[in-house]
From Swiss-Prot:
Superkingdom of the source species: Eukaryota
Cellular component annotations (GO), alphabetically ordered: chloroplast
Protein name, as recorded: Nicotinate-nucleotide pyrophosphorylase [carboxylating], chloroplastic
Stated role: Involved in the biosynthesis of NAD(+). Catalyzes the conversion of quinolate to nicotinate to nicotinate beta-D-ribonucleotide.
Residues annotated as binding substrate: R139, T170, R171, K172, R194, K204, E237, D264, S296, G297, N298, S317, G318, A319
Keyword Cell cycle among record annotations: no
Record-linked NCBIfam families: nadC
Gene: QPT
Extra remark beyond the main annotation: Accumulation of NAD by over-expression of the bacterial nadC gene in Arabidopsis stimulates plant resistance probably via salicylic acid (SA)-dependent signaling.
Species per Swiss-Prot/TrEMBL record: Arabidopsis thaliana (Mouse-ear cress)
Enzyme class: transferase
Keywords assigned by UniProt, alphabetized: Chloroplast, Glycosyltransferase, Plastid, Pyridine nucleotide biosynthesis, Transferase, Transit peptide
Transit peptide: 1-41
Pathway(s) it belongs to: Cofactor biosynthesis; NAD(+) biosynthesis; nicotinate D-ribonucleotide from quinolinate: step 1/1
Length: 348
């Protein structure tokens, strides 16, 4: 198992004291959402609707029957966020949005912000207010935070190892959570690839096959963009050095909108667990800075450093979002405080 602390930069351990100590000035109501690293833009994505859907699927048609049976309706409690393993926390701003939707009167206080390092056992935030509302929000916001923090943690590890290349995610995100997943990548220090099919032309193997070859595919895109008067980045996937040469030859004799060349599976895995990046380096030398380059395929936490030293501009990894391990985070009600409030209300 790979240790998170082995890869995280030292500055994540040197947390300023002002973040550790709880202070009244850091307290906010749930309606006062403070957003540090903003989510990426999307023309049709409604983050509030996603939150509403997540809460609705949990509540069903009756609401939280267990909560209604066990907790007095007017009971006030304080609960704290607990990191149960080391990592990068993400989803703080989203948690604020969820609390705001559930009950704007809840008081929320954070000792860490999105992108900060948390260690196992750290209480990094707290919320106080109506117990029913806090428990209703609990599972939904933890589902978001655990997934986002897992993505951010892996992204941080890979981004540090990949330098000077930039790490990118892909469109291999959880259905309905595209923006959330890509937001977590930004929080972890990565860069976003295209948001969807609409904001960048990306010529992949199926397009190339259907167009009758890589040159035909790139040429068709150039003609289409000119005809429609569209301005956007264009990337083409190459699988061999011969395809790289074909693209470069076409670009030398034509006016093209091409901006990036993907070098797919040019990282060759070896039996000893290492990788051979000879083909990747050869492709980068052929391109010689004329276009951005992106390495894809056989990218892991163990191989990304070697790939990053090859001279490529970007390294993309679907693993950042499609199979990431969630970071273990919990939300615990302060039992002693809850009992004291219960005694005062004569319901404990």
């Amino acid at each position: 198992m790979i240790s998170v602390s082995r890869f995280l930069s030292p500055q994540f351990y040197a947390i300023p004291r002002s973040f550790v100590k709880m202070s009244a000035s850091a307290t906010q109501t749930a309606g006062e959402v403070s957003m540090g690293i903003k989510p990426p833009s999307h023309p049709t994505y409604d983050l509030k609707a996603v939150i509403k859907l997540a809460l609705a699927e949990d509540a069903g048609h009756t609401g939280d029957v267990t909560c209604m049976a066990t907790i007095p309706f007017d009971m006030e409690v304080e609960a704290y966020f607990l990191a149960k393993e080391d990592g990068i926390v993400a989803g703080v701003a989203l948690a604020d949005m969820i609390f705001e939707h559930v009950d704007p009167s809840l008081k929320v206080e954070w000792m860490r912000k999105d992108g900060d390092y948390v260690h196992k056992g750290l209480k990094f935030g707290k919320v106080s207010g109506n117990a029913h509302k806090i428990v209703v929000a609990e599972r939904v916001l933890l589902n978001f935070m655990q997934r986002m923090s897992g993505i951010a943690t892996l992204t941080k590890l890979m981004a540090d190892a990949a330098s000077p290349a930039c790490i990118l995610e892909t469109r291999k995100t959880a259905p309905g959570l595209r923006l959330v997943d890509k937001w977590a990548v930004l929080i972890g220090g990565g860069r976003n690839h295209r948001m969807g099919l609409f904001d960048m032309v990306m010529i992949k193997d199926n397009h190339i096959s259907a167009a009758g070859g890589i040159v035909n595919a790139v040429k068709s895109v150039d003609e289409y963009l000119k005809q429609k008067n569209l301005e956007m980045d264009v990337e083409v996937e190459t699988r061999t050095l011969e395809e790289v040469k074909e693209v470069l030859e076409y670009a030398s004799g034509s006016e093209t909108r091409l901006t990036r060349i993907m070098l797919d599976n040019m990282v060759v895995p070896l039996e000893n667990g290492d990788v051979d990046v000879t083909m990747l380096k050869d492709a980068v030398e052929l391109i010689n800075g004329r276009f951005e380059t992106e390495a894809s395929g056989n990218v892991t936490l163990e191989t990304v450093h070697k790939i990053g030293q090859s001279g490529v501009t970007f390294i993309s990894s679907g693993a950042l979002t499609h199979s990431v391990k969630a970071l273990d985070i919990s939300l615990k009600i302060d039992t002693e405080l809850a009992l004291e409030v219960g005694r005062r209300t004569k319901r404990a």
